Amino acid sequence: IYRRLRGEVPFTFQEAAIISKELGISLDRIAGVSFSNNAMFDINVVDHGNPFETYYDFLNKHVKLFHTLREDPNASLGTASNVIPQTLYLKHELLAKFRFFKWMYQNEHIKCKHFEELEIPQKIINVQQDFAKLSHHIHSTDYIWDSMVFLHLINDIQYFSDIHLISDEMKQNLKEELLILTDELERLAIKGKTDFGNDVHIYVSQINFEATYSY
């Protein structure tokens, strides 16, 4: 530790992250780094005390970004994913709620209720709609999907049904929304354009993805 403090041995990334967290030190400011011209990477640090606000802030940040890009003819959006992208499912209220519900269930710091008992604030529903709509204004979008992208979602819904956190009626409602979404995606794939006339390219990969990556 002494040699690190003297600068003879550099801190590892993990050590620097711990120091930053515990002491409230901004590593960006120490390094004098400005990210105004760099691509944005988001490590989802979650405020467990208020997950709704964390989720809202995440969506609202991207809504503001989409606003700035909607008239840019060079703007492009790309994602390689093993789940259905937010740009496509967020306008469907139940599917969006399910993804949020699943995240809360997986987070050990948040006590999760039954799916029907989870009430999504209206401002989150509104920003979800804005997110989905504005993303379609991007001049060009490229999607690369895991071939299991729909099966992953179906299996997740069935799992929560099996452990009685989703009722049979609600499972049927989710199924109906998913069928509507697949119809929309079929039309999108055939046209190759959004309703605003912007290009969309969809590729289904035979290689399964470990995670989702976007730019």
Question: Which residues does each predicted region cover?
Answer:
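Short, highly charged low-complexity linear segments
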Residues: D28-A39, D57-K61, T79-A80, P121, ...
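Hydrophobic protein-protein interaction segments
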Residues: W103-Y215
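Generic structural signal of hydrophobic/aromatic residues within well-ordered alpha-helices
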Residues: L27, F52-Y55, L59-F66, L174, ...
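Arginine residue identity/basic-tract feature
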Residues: R3-R6, R29, R70, R99, ...
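Helix-turn-helix/homeodomain-like alpha-helical modules used for DNA recognition
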Residues: F35-E116
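Short, structured coil/loop segments at alpha-helix boundaries
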Residues: D28-G32, G49, P85, I166-K171
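A sequence-level detector of short, solvent-exposed, charge-rich linear segments
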Residues: S20, G24, N38, N74, ...
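Basic, Lys/Arg-rich alpha-helical nucleic-acid-recognition elements, primarily the DNA-binding modules
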Residues: I1-V46
